UniProtKB/Swiss-Prot annotation:
This is Leucine--tRNA ligase. One of its GO terms (molecular function) is leucine-tRNA ligase activity. It catalyses: tRNA(Leu) + L-leucine + ATP = L-leucyl-tRNA(Leu) + AMP + diphosphate. The gene is leuS. It comes from Prochlorococcus marinus (strain SARG / CCMP1375 / SS120). A motif ('HIGH' region) lies at residues 55-65. Keywords: Aminoacyl-tRNA synthetase, ATP-binding, Cytoplasm, Ligase, Nucleotide-binding, Protein biosynthesis. PANTHER family: LEUCINE--TRNA LIGASE, MITOCHONDRIAL, LEUCYL-TRNA SYNTHETASE.
Length: 870
């Protein structure tokens, strides 16, 4: 029988679903109640720290923000209902290039621009119905925050982890600042401005992240709650290589040698040349003087290339013979020394041995410059005479052309050659890393000042802690750092009290964001950035949610900082984030001309189903791509909320795709979630108006034997929904399948409600509302109050399921006679032991075997067997 509510249009609730009215009212109520303020945990209570990566305050939320924050909010709400003391804070990553550039473009001071954007975005976030504790808010550009960033810098400085040196750095010519290696993409462009990065020699501040390379690598094993791809990215970025350093002495230069690092000492006999980085420190000492002009020209040509361009496999690499030679230590062969664009001074020793027979890049280089190619390893199935110089053999094999090592497996030979070199003094075992120290100097004004002064007598001197914060020179400045530093700030030297110049560079904004999660837990502390007690209570973060683009930036820096601060005795934890969820992108539909690569606004397309370029009439490609203004595929969250309501927007974001996958925006699916909530509204509110429903009276146990078939069916679906939704949220974060389960429950309510008693309906609505609360908090709160629930739905306990309700009505009970199986009977789960005995004794099989004999014993294993002994 179909539900009367769905069957008869006149039986509709007296009030229609009005999401904007409901959501505005409840958001104001939650704020006034302080509902989401972090509560001090009791002795028996678990803590749960739910954290989204905090945003740069651009002024406008986009759908990527919405997805991130809603995912975290569902997790926070679930754990609050499960009885945990939950910390769910929010803040602002407010320093940096975008704010300064936006201020320049608009003629607005950076601080005014930033604080206005924060206010706007806070209001937008509040419309999402997030359970954020705003009392914990942090803003990195405020003195009360960056004072402690400077404090942490001084801790690193005192530990010898912050130092200054002249270095060739990545220079962004548009933003006019230095970039860390991690901030340059694979195409050699700035991750912010998109400019091709240049090389400059500047004096810069660095942090010794390399001191923690092994620990950062080894402790990845502790991160069982992180996605494997993120862990792999960090492992590759750290790039540990176990190998050998080999010294090649220079012919005709007493006691001058070039050290190379190799992971393939087995190929040493095949070394035909050495290649040095263009800025290798020994070049000027060994070069043929007639080659100096040519070298300078070569260096000029190379200087315009990025490291990525120099080391990529895409093209034949340029080189230049230096007019000098080295001596191969293992066979005394004289080999030429070259300089090559593909060798970087920043990696290992800045010199490599050229083994063209066994390295693809060396092979291309040798072919280009007609250098000899000598094979020293062959495949076990190949004859040495069959080898041709047509490609590099890069696998393991059998040694050839290698003197005493001929015939030995190449891997074993590598160990033997290293051992020989160590014994003779020209080799040693060595571990190297791709990881480089973290360059934190930025030539900008809108950033955290570095607390260092330059005294004419004492040199570099750290500012005293009691003098922190070193304030921004002029927080309302408009313009770029180096162009506006007309008034260099002066401070007294803490050692000799002389007037000294304050460091004018500011810190990389990742310095501010590498510890912000620590400040949330102790935000009112004006004596320390945080205390050990609070860190022990709340850290590590239980669930961190953010984009995978931060895998080797923020996430690696945060791990480093935690380890450095642990060594300083400031905290006890080893890792900052126990579990990490990297949500996929939100993609919108784009219309692109495949010939011109030009994106066309949908407003300029006459027929969306058959899209054509309005200028050329050419067919357009229809694609889903990351939302962007330039691609005309962005969707304003505010417009969606205005049209459908916050709960609908949340439900769509959670339902459309698993959280780790990309989400394709489709307004028809948004409408589908609106229809679902509207349907729930009609059934719940109409039932409240026509039935005796008061969930405060739901105190008695539901006896399954007393239920009608329809009631039993509904209760079974309800309990299965509780089980599945809980599993989806707690174990897998499969929000989409959890919402599907709620839809199944809704359908079951429609099918069965007219034949169910008020108490069953009340129990169903109570648990449905609790299950709905993390996903659609406003409509759930409205249901809860109308159902006469106590307090807020969000302060009530998460429901648990009754396993008995999931069982089939009957099951087969095996009958044993004197321990042997003789048959089975159909019984009900609710049958008592007496009822089971009577049914077993009454069945034909039992009577046949007993043949009138009275049983001595009857043993029952409920749900399985009954054993009758006579």
């Amino acid at each position: 029988m179909a539900s009367k509510i769905s069957q008869t249009p006149e039986k509709q609730p007296s009030t229609a679903y009005d999401p904007l009215s409901i959501e505005t009212r409840w958001q104001q109520s939650w704020k006034e109640q302080g509902l989401y303020k972090t509560k001090e945990p009791t002795k028996s209570q678990k803590t749960f720290y739910a954290l989204s990566m905090f945003p740069y305050p651009s002024g406008t939320l986009h759908m990527g923000h919405v997805r991130n924050y809603v995912i975290t909010d569902v997790i926070a709400r679930l754990h609050r209902m499960k009885g945990d003391s939950v910390l769910h804070p929010m803040g602002w990553d407010a320093f940096g290039l975008p704010a300064e550039n936006a201020a320049i473009e608009r003629g607005i001071p950076a601080d005014i621009w930033t604080y206005k954007n924060i206010e706007d975005m806070r209001n937008q976030l509040n419309r999402l119905g997030l359970s954020i504790d705003w009392d914990k808010e942090v803003t990195t550009c405020k003195e009360e925050y960056y004072k402690w960033t400077q404090y942490i810098f001084l801790e690193l400085y005192e530990a010898g982890l912050a130092y200054q040196k002249s270095a060739t750095v990545n220079w962004d010519p548009i933003d006019k600042t230095v970039l860390a290696n991690e901030q340059v993409d694979a195409n050699g462009r700035s991750w912010r401005s998109g400019a091709l990065v240049e090389k400059k020699k500047l004096k810069q501040w660095f942090l010794k992240i390399t001191d923690f390379a092994d620990e950062l690598l080894e402790d990845i094993e502790l991160l069982s709650g992180w996605p494997q791809n993120v862990k792999t990215m960090q492992q590759n970025w750290i790039g540990r290589s176990n190998g050998t350093e080999i010294d090649f002495y220079i012919k005709g230069k007493n006691n001058i040698f070039i050290t190379v690092f190799t992971t393939r000492p087995d190929t040493l006999h095949g070394t035909e040349y050495l290649v040095l980085a263009p800025d290798h420190e020994l070049i000027n000492s060994i070069i043929d003087k007639n080659k100096i002009t040519e070298l300078e020209q070569f260096r000029t040509e190379i200087s315009i290339l990025t490291d990525q361009e120099r080391t990529s496999d895409g093209n034949n690499k340029r080189g230049m013979f230096l007019g000098c030679h080295a001596i191969n230590p293992i066979n005394k062969k004289i080999i030429p020394i070259w300089v090559g664009e593909y060798v970087l001074s920043s990696y290992a020793t800045g010199a490599v041995m050229g083994v063209p027979a066994h390295d693809k890049r060396d092979y291309k280089f040798a072919k280009k410059y007609s250098l000899p190619i000598q094979y020293v390893i062959k495949s076990p199935s190949q004859e040495a005479s069959d080898l041709e110089a047509s490609s590099a053999y890069v696998k393991e094999g059998i040694m050839i052309n290698s003197g005493e090592f001929n015939g030995i497996n190449s891997k074993e030979a590598g160990f033997m050659i290293t051992k020989l070199g160590v014994k003779q003094g020209w080799a040693k075992n060595k571990v190297t890393y791709k990881l480089r120290d973290w360059l934190i100097s930025r030539q900008r004004m809108w950033g955290c000042p570095i607390p260092i002064i330059y005294c004419p007598d004492c040199g570099s001197v750290p500012v005293k802690r009691e003098e922190l914060p070193v304030k921004l020179t002029n927080p309302s400045v408009i313009g770029k750092s180096q162009e506006n530093k007309n008034n260099i700030p002066i401070m007294k030297c803490s050692k000799c009290n002389k007037d000294s110049i304050l460091e004018t560079d500011t810190m990389d904004t990742f310095m501010c964001s590498s510890w912000y999660f620590l400040r949330y837990i102790d935000v009112e502390n004006n004596k320390l950035p945080f205390t050990k007690t609070e860190v022990d209570k709340w850290l590590p973060v239980d669930q961190y949610v953010g984009g995978i683009e931060h895998a080797i930036l923020h996430l690696l820096y945060s791990r480093f900082l935690i380890k450095a601060l642990r060594n300083r005795g400031l905290l006890n934890i080893k890792e900052p984030f126990s579990n990490l969820l990297t949500q996929g992108m939100v993609q919108g539909v784009t219309f692109k001309n495949p010939k011109t690569s030009k994106y066309i606004s949908p407003d300029h397309i006459n027929d969306i189903n058959t899209p054509l370029d309005p200028e050329t009439g050419e067919p357009l490609d229809v694609l889903y791509e990351k939302m962007s203004k330039s691609k005309y595929n962005g969707v304003d969250p505010a417009s969606v909320i205005d049209k459908y309501g916050t709960d609908t927007a949340r439900m769509f974001i959670l339902f459309k795709a698993p959280p780790e996958k990309d989400l394709e925006w489709d307004e028809s699916d948004v409408e589908g979630q609106y229809r679902f909530l509207n349907r729930l509204w009609r059934i719940v509110i109409y039932s409240i108006e026509t039935k005796d429903i008061n969930i405060s009276n739901c105190t008695q146990e539901i006896l399954l034997n007393d239920l009608s078939d329809k009631e039993r069916k509904l209760i079974k679906v309800l309990n299965n929904t509780i089980k599945e939704v809980t599993n989806d949220l707690v174990n897998d974060f499969q929000f989409n399948t959890a919402i599907s389960e709620l839809m199944i429950l809704c359908n079951s309510i429609y099918e069965n409600i007219d034949d169910c008693g008020d108490y069953i309906v009340t129990e169903t609505f109570k648990k449905l509302t609790l299950l709905l609360a993390p996903f659609a908090p406003h409509i759930a709160e409205e249901f809860w109050i109308k159902l006469k629930g106590k307090g807020s739905v969000h302060e009530n306990s998460w429901p648990t399921y009754d396993p008995k309700a999931l069982l089939e009505d009957s099951y087969k009970l095996i009958i044993q006679i004197n321990g042997k199986v003789r048959g089975n009977i159909s019984v009900n789960h609710e049958d008592s032991e007496l009822e089971l005995k009577n049914k077993a004794l009454a069945c034909e099989t039992t009577q046949k075997w007993l043949n009138g004999i009275e049983p001595k014993r009857i043993i029952i294993v409920k749900g399985k067997i009954i054993n009758i002994v006579f």
